[in-house]
Each structure stands twice: as C-alpha cells, then as structure tokens.
Amino acid sequence: MALDIDTAALLLDQLGNQTRLRIVRLLVRAGEEGRTVGDLQRAIEIPASTLSHHLSHLRSAGLVWQERQGTVLNCFVAFKKVSELVDFLTAECCVDVPAGNVHRRAAG
C-alpha cells in the first residue's frame, strides 16, 4: 500500500534524528539477521536508556520491530516500511520535466 503524505512526514520526522537514523542504517546493514539491543548500544555508544527511548520511537512509527529470544532482545528494520518510504519519495521523480530533458547530474 502506498504511503500518504502524513505517514511519510511522520516517518521522515523519526528519521530526522541522527541517533534514530544511525539505528535504522545499522539494522538495514544487518539484513534479516537483525542486531541485538546490546550490539546496537555498543555500535552507537549510547546509554541503554537512551537507546530504548529511540527504539520506542522507531517501533511506534513502524520502522523497527523487536523479537525476544530468551534473554536477548533482537531488533530488525521493517524493510517493507522503509521501501514504501523510498517509493513515496521517488514516485513522481521527473514527472514535470519534458521528455528528453532529463539529465542526471553527478553528485558532488
């Protein structure tokens, strides 16, 4: 299902925080394996309470989900939600540019 502008804005608001963006990027890199809360805490070097706060925001937005396995809490990125956000951002790419006038500029 395509995102509406309000949902996209909420997701972008959550990703506008550097720590949350770092968490999501680490989880994207981890793929389907995810990462434990302890791994995330060591990678980002923040207190457990701060990490918990940011994970709560990401879970509420549907960008991250967690699964407990015994005493270990694993975190995973919601790939479908992230993909929907990327699709929302690029859905109308270049629609206002006349055909034949689309030029890609090198980054930098």
Task: List each model region and its residues.
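Short glycine/serine/threonine-biased micro-segments
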Residues: 14, 54, 60, 68
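Alpha-helical residues within the helix-turn-helix
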Residues: 42, 59-60
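Amphipathic alpha-helical dimerization/coiled-coil segments
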Residues: 1-7, 25-29, 79-108
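N-terminal helix-turn-helix DNA-binding core of bacterial DNA-binding proteins
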Residues: 6-47, 69-82
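Conserved catalytic-core motifs of GNAT/GCN5-like acyltransferases
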Residues: 67-69, 98-99
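Short coil turns linking two alpha-helices in DNA-binding domains
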Residues: 47, 52-54
